[in-house]
Amino acid sequence: MEFPRKRRGRDSQPLQSEFMTDTTVESLPQNPFASLLSTRTGVSAPSGIREAHSQMEKRRRDKMNHLIQKLSSMIPPHIPTAHKLDKLSVLRRAVQYLRSLRGMTELYLGENSKPSFIQDKELSHLILKAAEGFLFVVGCERGRIFYVSKSVSKTLRYDQASLIGQNLFDFLHPKDVAKVKEQLSCDGSPREKPIDTKTSQVYSHPYTGRPRMHSGSRRSFFFRMKSCTVPVKEEQPCSSCSKKKDHRKFHTVHCTGYLRSWPLNVVGMEKESGGGKDSGPLTCLVAMGRLHPYIVPQKSGKINVRPAEFITRFAMNGKFVYVDQRATAILGYLPQELLGTSCYEYFHQDDHSSLTDKHKAVLQSKEKILTDSYKFRVKDGAFVTLKSEWFSFTNPWTKELEYIVSVNTLVLGRSETRLSLLHCGGSSQSSEDSFRQSCINVPGVSTGTVLGAGSIGTDIANEVLSLQRLHSSSPEDASPSEEVRDDCSVNGGNAYGPASTREPFAVSPSETEVLEAARQHQSTEPAHPHGPLPGDSAQLGFDVLCDSDSIDMAAFMNYLEAEGGLGDPGDFSDIQWAL
């Protein structure tokens, strides 16, 4: 009888694997690494091992789900959702919440905000003393006053016991109730409550930890609170009392604080929100109230505005050399219309005497000279009242007076000045008539110009220069060039160039005698009196200028002839040369 031939590797393998499996099962309790060896050698694990591994994975998943569920209950729901969040969403919101808490300072974290050596009562006393107000806590739901400090008696004259437990809206002005309700209604946490889709119940997460502040919960607003002397009752919105009486009945309070949330068991006010099981934490306004000072407006119809101003400059003889563009809106003249004209042509005749005194004072002093109110003629012939501040400008290099700066301020307009002239009486009316009679109308000259007014400034400049020569050194010490420089500076310019660049010329002995005679003639001239000066004296001053220029030119020509060999050089040893 023949048996079938057995192939190698087919029948022997099951026997070998069965043998190894029995051995592995027997050695499992003793050798924990047998399962790895059996897996590597291709031996399948028994059902007991697979069951133990499944139980271990289940416990791990249950623990992770419990931790995620606990984490989701600790995160405040920013947006209430109808479905349950998955694990990834819970972890993402947890990360966002931790990032938002990272920027919070220790000032808002409760007990860590105060030093360890200060007690709570001492800290509250220092805060109230430094704030100069009163601390109060108001519920955001109904406006009930939970707490108010004793300092309210000093600020609003209320007793602490009379305010605690009352409604804040009963003490406010009727027009401020809506504004305060708006400030209390904007809470940092949402009003909606999330609902579970499976159980159809509202999530009731226990309140754990101290209340924290959130961004956007700060409040700062004003409201009017009734005074203690007025009985607490509702007033009609449309009251006929004046603002002054309203100020006596109400005090303006500046409120600054934060919205905070507390559990009902901590506050002890379960009835404030209805006392339901699903009611959330109580939101309150913790604020500091300061009395805002009330300023009673003055009973005046005038509006304080900056007066209209413009700046002008005029030379020593009173002729304009610069006019500000703002003068056009006040006077009506363009700047180029005033340049080169004398300021006395526009002054009222009654003001000439006072303005000439100020003109002399500003030429002899370096201080600012304030003029009285005077009348200035505008382009249409009317007058405006101005007040000016004059001061002279001296060139720091040449030490010579270049011009006078005038800062002009408008006091009265055209209509006011006309009324003031009418109220002055007959004397002013007669002076006005004489002023109109003295005015001339010449082509090329501004209308209403006073006869001889253009030479008043030139006469004043000549008079001041003569006084300065008398008060200075003796006439023998002065050189002829100084005489010419002083006379030419009266008109605000020079005939042959700037005074600082002119050199003294050599003159002959005969010409020196002529200069001495001219100087003695000028020194013996009498001073001109105040007021409108005649035209002869002004013409005399200009004649002297012309004579001095002629003598100067003659000396210059004599010097050129001597240099070119055309004439006798003469003797120059007796001439005093200015260095």
Curated annotation (Swiss-Prot):
Taxonomic superkingdom: Eukaryota
Record CDD domains: PAS
A GO CC term attached to the entry: nucleolus
Glycyl lysine isopeptide (Lys-Gly) (interchain with G-Cter in SUMO2) crosslink residues: K233
Subunit structure: Component of the circadian core oscillator, which includes the CRY proteins, CLOCK, or NPAS2, BMAL1 or BMAL2, CSNK1D and/or CSNK1E, TIMELESS and the PER proteins. Interacts directly with CLOCK to form the BMAL2-CLOCK transactivator. Can form heterodimers or homodimers which interact directly with CLOCK to form the transcription activator. Interacts with NPAS2 and HIF1A. Interacts with PER2.
Protein's recorded name: Basic helix-loop-helix ARNT-like protein 2
Molecular functions (GO terms): DNA-binding transcription factor activity; DNA-binding transcription factor activity, RNA polymerase II-specific; E-box binding; protein dimerization activity
